Swiss-Prot record:
Name of the molecule in the record: NADH-quinone oxidoreductase subunit B
Keywords, ordered alphabetically: 4Fe-4S, Cell inner membrane, Cell membrane, Iron, Iron-sulfur, Membrane, Metal-binding, NAD, Quinone, Translocase, Transport, Ubiquinone
Cofactor(s), by name: [4Fe-4S] cluster
GO process annotations (BP): aerobic respiration; electron transport coupled proton transport
Record lineage: Bacteria, Pseudomonadati, Pseudomonadota, Betaproteobacteria, Rhodocyclales
Catalytic activities: a quinone + NADH + 5 H(+)(in) = a quinol + NAD(+) + 4 H(+)(out)
Protein family: Belongs to the complex I 20 kDa subunit family.
Subcellular location: Cell inner membrane
One GO MF term: NADH:ubiquinone reductase (non-electrogenic) activity
Length: 158
């Protein structure tokens, strides 16, 4: 039965989990944490050619207004405490997308003394987007995967 048939009867039944997760997937507000060249591709995903707004994704300037952090680029030891501080300022529930080889595991600079070998050593990561740099399409695919992950989670503890 389609949703139109249910609406003609005057009511719709669902669970609170599905309703809450549906609302969360349609209003992801990421905060950009651009550290290197991957940030340029992240900007490409926000312009009119790819238009992240159609997925309900609106970039926010403040961590207190965001529920998704996109870490794009090489994370250094000096920048790691700032990343953790920004992550801690985000409201719950919060998710992290690691974008690019450098954010995923250090990338080309993996053996450098000043590079953190993956941002998952500082903050918990939900989605990894591979590439050097990953394309805007890859980031959009990662955001869609995050939306699917949010739909599968249980919001209300039982």
């Amino acid at each position: 039965m389609a949703i139109e048939g249910v609406l003609q009867e005057g009511f719709v039944t669902t669970t609170a989990d599905k309703l809450i997760n549906y609302m969360r997937t349609g209003s992801l507000w990421p905060m950009t944490f651009g550290l290197a060249c991957c940030a340029v591709e992240m900007i490409h995903a926000g312009v009119s050619r790819y238009d992240l707004d159609r997925f309900g994704v609106v970039f926010r300037p403040s961590p207190r207004q965001s529920d998704v952090m996109i870490v794009a680029g090489t994370l250094t030891n000096k920048m790691a405490p700032a990343l953790r501080k920004v992550y801690d300022q985000m409201a719950e529930p919060r998710w992290v997308i690691s974008m690019g080889s450098c954010a995923n595991g250090g990338g080309y600079y993996h053996y450098s003394y000043s590079v953190v070998r993956g941002c998952d050593r500082i903050v918990p990561v939900d989605i990894y987007v591979p590439g050097c740099p990953p394309t805007a399409e890859a980031l959009i695919y990662g955001i869609i995967q995050l939306q699917n992950k949010i739909r599968r989670t249980n919001t209300i503890a039982r």
